[in-house]
Amino acid sequence: MRILLVEDSKPLRRENEGALQRAGYEVICAEDGESALEMAQGGHPDLILLDMILPKMTGPEVLRHLKSDARTKDIPVVVLSSLSEKNRQKLMEEGADDYLEKGALMPMRGLNLLPQALENVICRINRKRGIPFSNIPVHR
């Protein structure tokens, strides 16, 4: 599974990229909203992990562009942020497929929780889309 990780914080981007790669995912990265759109259109990711506070274009703007473009509208987008419940619900209404609380994923004692959380999200997204459990692409 190819994941586009959109995160402007270089240390956090490196940490999460490494954790996802160790879990068996192929990872491509973008550090701002504009490059996220370019990589989503040309990099053919299976899923996008999208931070909300980005330079050049905000996460919500990126989400709106992704969901209005025929080339990217069907790519699942998982929001990574620490937004309020109201803002989270608005993003889901605008097309985000799921949400991961950034603070809950912070490495604890050297353990990055993103790969495990992502597997749960992928299962939820596939259930919503009617994909049978046996066809869920989970890497271990």
Language model features by range: what are they?
Residues 29-47:
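Acidic, metal-coordinating helix/loop segments flanking the phosphotransfer/catalytic sites
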Residues 7:
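Conserved acidic carboxylate
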Residues 51:
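Active-site residues of response regulator receiver
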Residues 107, 111, 120-140:
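CheY-like receiver
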Residues 10-28:
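Two-component/phosphorelay signaling modules centered on CheY-like receiver
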Residues 55, 73:
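The feature encodes the CheY-like receiver
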